[in-house]
Amino acid sequence: MPIEKRRWIPTALLSSVERLVKIRSVSREKDWKIRISSSLRVSLKIMTSFKWRGSFSWSQRLATCGDRSIDGDFENVDDYSLYEGMKQIAKTGKVLAIHAENAAVTDRLGEIAKANGETTLAAYVDSRPVFTEVEAIQRAILFSKETGCPIHICHVACKEGVDAVVKAQEEGINVTCETCVHYLYFTKDELDAIGPVVKCSPPIREQAQKDALWQRVEDGKVAFVTSDHSPCTPDLKDTDNAFDAWGGISGVQNDVDVMFDEAMQKRGMALKDFAKLIAINPADRYNLTQKGRISIGKDADFVLIKPNAPYTLTADDLEYQNKISPYIGREIGAQVVQTILRGQTIYSQADGVTADFPGQFIK
């Protein structure tokens, strides 16, 4: 979720957002959106002023993605603010995207683990048990039912979370969910061998959870699969204590090739279903009317993938400013060879990322 350069938005002034739009519009290759996570009331005012097309986003959890206190990072939202915000958002018809974890429990469990001298990623996972994720999802669903606010549960890491969403859908509640590539790729038992670079929140769980998530993805119960790209500078991952490391994964560059390999090449997923997971469903849910489909009148956005072309990811392959990724050293069975945005090539294997084609701000 966080942006890579930590350009925090002073949400007290709408002009700050307008200024950021101008800055980013001349410096980014891809189309992009803003996530505002400060004062609830001010965030709503800014988004309404911009006639926001997509979604609102708040976090039902910690002020950071780990136990490290980082000035300016995302803040937790209390229940009343969430409830009031959802009542206001319901009037707009927009979707509220929620990071769902029970911070009251995970904070305390993390403190106890640290006090007991725990330092491993396995212990970090244990400090964020499944029920803390599920309880927050169920609470968000209840608030959605009471307020009529459409919601989307971000980065679900457990089968119980998906099942709660499916049950709510059957009751007529407007809720969807996603999972992430890393929850479908890694497992808890390999985390400590990889190191803090693979720490995230909610955490990567056991093999049984991974298998169950895959089943729900294949059954169409998960709306889309994302990267939850959450980069940081290397120093925030450079620690022997997992509880002190930044809790986020840099994954957006390998979201498509890893998922293509795992879903289509290894599990036989149909191309049309793959396209729904990574393009069609996200565009539909967030009302990105020009995106998600190859169709006359829509933006000509394409990604060209070379199948059955394994390669081993290295740090030199990464286009990130901070070249860290849990996928480094992994063999990926497909390659993204070209990316086209509105009919123009913005990336190719031969030339890398273009330097002269700015993206656009999508309101």
Q: What are these regions, as identified by a protein language model?
A:
Residues 119-150, 197, 218-219, 223-225, ...:
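His/Asp/Glu-enriched, well-ordered alpha-helical/loop segment
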Residues 106, 162, 185, 233-235, ...:
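Glycine/Thr-rich phosphate-binding loops of Rossmann-like dinucleotide-binding domains
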Residues 102, 158, 181, 231, ...:
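Short, glycine/acidic-enriched loop or turn micro-motifs at the edges of active sites
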Residues 63-225:
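Histidine/acidic residue-rich metal-binding segments in metalloenzymes
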Residues 50, 108-109, 187-190, 236-238, ...:
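Short, well-ordered secondary-structure micro-motifs
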Residues 1-105, 109:
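Divalent-metal coordination cores built from histidine and acidic residues
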Residues 56-59, 148, 219, 333:
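Alpha-helix termination/capping residues and helix-transition junctions
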Residues 241, 296-362:
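C-terminal cap of metal-dependent C-N hydrolases
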